[in-house]
């Protein structure tokens, strides 16, 4: 018997694979149902060659075929036609019309093959099967494929010890047409059996169907749910059934995959999102121009606040005092200072990237912000009334060396001229900054009733004296005139003589200003800074300074001489006493 597997693997053009051919194990291949075959008659096997030779010989020898038909008449298979004919779909045959002739093929049961070239019959001992024919009307299809228009009903085939079977035979069996007829199903069995033979029920598309049946049937039978049967419901087109499986399978696969990988995917997506977000934030500070840096300010560093409060005060009063002090700091025009890794950033025009502040920078925690006073002199904010604050300021003024403060007065001594020495009208630049702070403190806190008005004025005058103010030309001229008259060693007398009404001028200020004038007169005019002082006054300063210096030297010499004389007189008196 010819192996069914051999026929399936090495199929030929004149033989068709049975309808219950084995389907592939995997139905997950989503390829097209039909595939064109470039080479039609390549790799022809021995059985295919034998069938071709038999077909040609049977076509040429018509007389021998007629004799074979007569021999078959005695053992013709009984044909039973069912009462209800089932609709059959067209079967593709030869692409051209021709007379139907018996095509010799038989299934060998016992494995012994006797080749009769004329009738192409195989005999296997007592049991054999021969091929007959029946008539069909064939018309060509649009693309050349023949379609069966009038087909006979199902044929009951009985195989026994001496039975012979007739199957349709076509002239020129080995032509280039498509053979979709279902072949006989034979198996090795001791008992007789019968089975229906169904013509192939296939609806052809306008395009050419591949001729090699092996690959085509493999694709059509790709479904795992293939069931063979004789009912009409099972004869639906194979292509639609396969497409249904092709559509339903990805949905099932997707549902199964989502159900399995939900728990795993959620964690992975979350980690990926966080990772991408962090990398994006890191790279954007260097790439994008509109990137932002997120900072969190926990606290500010404020200047020191000196608060003194009696022990009998309440906690609420302490809180109010601290709040007043902080509000005073914020309302006095304080500015914000920035320190990066302990280094103060002074240039406000630098960008954050140039300073080293970026999103991926690890130094964001080392940023320090502080409130700094806008003025150079820090203001002393206390909870004391006005009198106590001024009493604390006064020792500070006395302890400070005003000589250092007034040392540079000669640079801008003539900036603000005035008509008289007693003129108290001063410009905005000459106003004391501490007096502004004192006025603010006085507006916020009321002075106690025990403090007199006179003490307040004295405290204000003491606070005003510690502020350096430039000398006008008139004040310089008055100072020179007083020094020429009284000398350089009598500064208290100079203050009472020339600056009695100027409360903001002390004898120390006058002494420092005189030293500055002497230094300015000794240097060249190119080295002088500020508004120049008239040269006449500078000459008078030099003359007065030289004169009084000489006088002081003479006075000192006289004093030394007196001391020497006294010592000599004492020594002589002592010697006389001895």
Swiss-Prot record:
Residues 440-467 are annotated as: Disordered. Residues 465-469, 511-515, 522-529 are annotated as: Interaction with DNA. SMART domains: SANT. It is found in: Nucleus. Disruption phenotype: No visible phenotype, probably due to redundancy. Residues 463-522 form the HTH myb-type domain. Keywords: DNA-binding, Nucleus, Transcription, Transcription regulation. InterPro entries: Homeodomain-like_sf (IPR009057), Myb_dom (IPR017930), SANT/Myb (IPR001005), TRP_plant (IPR031105), Ubiquitin-like_dom (IPR000626), Ubiquitin-like_domsf (IPR029071). GO terms for molecular function: double-stranded telomeric DNA binding. Its main location: nucleus. It comes from the Eukaryota. Expressed ubiquitously. Highest expression in flowers and leaves. Coiled coil: none annotated. Residues 293-372 form the Ubiquitin-like domain. One of its GO terms (biological process) is ethylene-activated signaling pathway. GO terms for cellular component: cytoplasm; membrane; nuclear membrane; plasma membrane. It holds the Pfam family Ubiquitin_TPR1. Residues 491-518 bind DNA. SUPFAM superfamilies: Homeodomain-like, Ubiquitin-like. Binds specifically to the plant telomeric double-stranded DNA sequences 5'-GGTTTAG-3'. At least 4 repeats of telomeric sequences are required for binding. Induces DNA bending. Homodimer and heterodimer with TRP2 and TRP3. Interacts with KU70. A N-terminal domain (80-269) is responsible for the interaction with KU70. The C-terminal domain (464-578) is sufficient for telomere binding. This is Telomere repeat-binding protein 1. The lineage of its organism: Eukaryota, Viridiplantae, Streptophyta, Embryophyta, Tracheophyta.
